[in-house]
Amino acid sequence: MLFITNRVLKEGPTPMSGDQPLVPRSVNFNLSNNQAEQSVYFCRREQKGAYTEIGGQAFLTELKNLDKKEIFLYVHGYSNLPEPAIFPRAEQLQRLFDQKSPGYMVVVPIIWPCDNNEGQIKDYFDDQIATDQSGVAFARLFQKFLAWREHNSTVESPCTKRINILAHSMGNRVLRSTFASIVQYFLPQGMPLVFRNIFMASADVVNEALEPGQEGQYISPAARNVLVYYAADDLAMRASKVANIGEIASRRLGHTGPEHMYKVNKNVYALDCDDFNTDYDPPVGHGYFAGDHQGNAGLVFDHMWRCIETGRVSKDPLESRTIILNRGWLLSSN
């Protein structure tokens, strides 16, 4: 499995010979160090606990040449470490996509530096800092991708793969920080339309984040569709509302959906998952975006898949941008 990370590696930064990286090389995560590197590492997971840094050019070329139609970037949430959580969840997503259509999608995790000690509250604050610091690193990643695409996706040899993003929980803070850094440092005129769908699941950002003038304002211009999955009984969101840097209590996007739908762009959709989120992730109801305990695709995954397949958001009535997601939706959409 290909992946990208800005976690500190035990082997240190990528060694260079002149301006050329000395890759491939075997690497491993330094899990005791949650500093956010300002460099990103393009890697492959060979098996559990075995990773190879292959470098940006090889990574992007391999991704382009894969016999897949679309790319699914997965940005994980708070307090997730690579092997206990991130890679198994990415493998689950890959398996569910393969069940829908073998060979259609490749899942690529983007791994930022979560903390692994000191208790949940300190971990939460540390992870907030790491997400903000990671924004610059992943903004540089975006620029590298645009530069690579300019020289390697030509009329003679185009890269036609659509790109989708799923950000879960605090991963949405990484997304917000990344896009804000892209505009601040690289593209002052705004984000280009690069992504097919951006799925924001249990988003741990304020519920005004997507409005003009807010820190997440650059997310919706970057995608054809932005889908916000939220649940009022997501217990992690209730705790997050008060456990934030600066002691500012604010309702979360993953708890209520957008505060003012009329203020966000018309490509933003809010999906109420309150009917089933605790069925998939009891009792907290926070990690409900993939499958059930039997390995079947869940409602959110089925909805994401329909959006990926069609490029459109199924809704009833057609003009509605706020949707109650339940089994009735699934039956009516078939």
Region locations from a protein language model:
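Short beta-strand element of the alpha/beta-hydrolase
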Residues: K69-G77
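Gly/Ala-rich beta-loop-alpha elbow adjacent to hydrolase catalytic centers
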Residues: F138, A167, G171, L175
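Lipolytic serine-hydrolase domain surface
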Residues: M1-A50, N65, S79-N80, E91, ...
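"Short basic amphipathic alpha-helical interaction patches in structured regions
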Residues: P84-Q94
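Residue in the alpha/beta-hydrolase core beta-strand immediately N-terminal to the catalytic nucleophile
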Residues: N164, H168-S169, F199
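Histidine-centered divalent metal-coordination motifs
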Residues: H76, H168, H286
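Gly/Ser/Thr-rich loops at beta-strand to alpha-helix junctions
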Residues: G77-P82, N172
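Short beta-strand-to-loop junctions in surface cap/lid or active-site-entrance loops
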Residues: A58-D67
